């Protein structure tokens, strides 16, 4: 998250938020990270030794058998839908703020000039909300924390729908703040759910499957679907109808929230969370 913030500030303040130079900056950072990774200590995986593992186990495909468990399968499905929501905000958040330059009254506003910096409030919020997760987990349990995340996604998109760089600036700021809850509460509570619902021999693969459903399949689903819908229904020669776009995203998140509350059954057991270690 801190690296995310640093990248956003660097590209915006150097005037590269919309230029090809941002990819050079990312490439240099990636090379540095790759070199640093070779200096990290070895961490052997739990479970069977590699000699006794099948090829399916070695490449992590054994985790797909978790779909045979109804509750886990339902959780991974909702993870994909929430991953799509994350892709929506990553793909269009900054573009939306920058697009206010089309309106004469906002063309010279700080929101347009520093759109990426303003969006970075979302990541700053992440670092703060993650500190509140232990309290919420103990007080409400994993399912309720996930539901809070989904409600936060509804607010994230809904506030964007009505925000503007003028008297609606507060909505944009609040939208960025609630993003921290939307992102952290599902990702952390979801990871804990996987941790407490799977056997230690398959746990690392299960966590990988969780990430793949959110940042893999979810991102693909969100990108393809939103791109088609926006171009087909919400784009004209005058530009994009951002108000309706964000309202549509908010309705999407609301439907997911209601469906999750109805279909996902999970009994909170505080002892499970307390037993989770590193």
Language-model features and meaning:
Residues 42-76, 102-107:
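Juxtamembrane intracellular "pre-TM" segments in multi-pass secondary transporters
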Residues 12-29, 228-253:
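A membrane-interface helix-boundary motif in multi-pass transporters
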Residues 151-165:
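C-terminal ends and interior cores of transmembrane alpha-helices
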Residues 30-42, 245-278:
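Multi-pass alpha-helical transporter architecture, strongest
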Residues 11, 128-142, 230-231:
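Helix-to-loop junctions at the C-terminal end of transmembrane segments
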Residues 68-89, 177-178:
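Pair of pore-lining "gating" transmembrane helices in MFS-fold secondary transporters
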Residues 185-199:
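Intracellular juxtamembrane helix-capping segments at the cytosolic ends
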Residues 91-115:
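Short amphipathic helix-loop junctions that connect adjacent transmembrane helices
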